[in-house]
Amino acid sequence: MTKQPLRIGITCYPTYGGSGVIASELGLQLARIGHEVHFISYDRPFRIPAFQERVYFHKVQVVEYPLFQYPPYSLALTSKMVEVANQAHLDLIHVHYAVPHTSSAYMAKQMLDGNLKIVTTLHGTDITLVGSNPNYMPITRFSLEHSDGITSVSEFLREETLETFGITVPIEVIPNFIDPDIFIKQANPKTRETFAPHGEKIVMHLSNFRPVKRLGDIVDVFALVQKEIPAKLLLVGDGPERYKAEQHIREHGVGEHVKFLGKQEAIVELFSIADVYFLPSETESFGLSALEAMSCQVPVVATSVGGLPEVVVHGETGFLCSVGDVHEMAEAIKLLLRDDRKRQAMGKSARHRAISLFNIHDIVPKYESYYWTLLS
């Protein structure tokens, strides 16, 4: 088969989370290197600009009808996939996050008499939390087994999927990635002074503030750090646990040292002023925000769970601690904040690891090669 540009459909959640970020950046990079990319979702993914050459967005319209307690998004998505596949002559549809995208893609393929390849990328909670729920497991397993290709963002997630679902189809590990030309440390003395006017150290956390991120631990750990080291905590993002976290902050009496920044576009500017990035999650299938921090020369203190040990090297690019051990995590952060030389050395090692192993210019060609293998 002549390797001419492909016409690729991409379906993802358009929200503020790792799967949507990776799907968006993958599509944009595929377009930059010559492929035609069609995003199909209920809203424009937040990193997709209004216009970029060879990038198109197709909005899924969900019908509201009194008979439906819950609007049937998966059916509307299937119909839109078929419509776009026919009109744009798609070679394949690449869905990110299995539930419900993979089952919608399977139905679309059947409606197209099998003339459409399906690639499913597993990102984490689609398998570990949602897909493994008894209500969704049968359809998730069936849809995965009928995908033409499956990729996973970490070796941990690959093993977890095989064990949980008992499927026999091969799963290719293609890790998440960063663009090292974008995620690069910037000199921002004015921004730093805004948040730390008296030279305080800065600890940063970025997430969707869901229970799995353990915001309570973040506050507990920061309170322990703040007792000994003048520091500020920047909490970037938003989500269901914010109110509890605010209460917890008041209980500890550290409110004047904590800033909730909400959802931010200028992430690199914030990473660039951070001294430590903190990710004490219950589980992480990869930990994209940790990788982004590392690329900006920020050492990471995280939990030794899921795919995080595949990203963060303990004692070299940061520290990995036990889930819920607030004293261990506090000691790791204090060690980094007190020792400028160690912190800077770990930051440089973190940057080197990020650009050596998780570079967009190395990872996207792996997806490209994977597509060609399936199509041939």
Where are these regions (language model features)?
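Conserved acidic donor-binding segment of nucleotide-sugar-dependent glycosyltransferases
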Residues: 314-315, 319-326, 335-340
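A short helix/loop element that forms part of the nucleotide-sugar donor recognition site in Leloir-type
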Residues: 184-197
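Aromatic "clamp/platform" in nucleotide-sugar-dependent glycosyltransferases that forms part
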Residues: 263, 282
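Conserved donor-binding/catalytic core segment of Leloir-type glycosyltransferases
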Residues: 196-222
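Short hydrophobic beta-strand element within catalytic cores of glycosyltransferases
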Residues: 299-302, 312
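Carbohydrate-associated surface elements
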Residues: 156, 177
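Nucleotide-activated donor-binding/catalytic signature segment of Leloir-type glycosyltransferases, i.e.
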Residues: 246-262
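N-terminal strand-loop element at the rim of the active site
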Residues: 12-16, 28-73
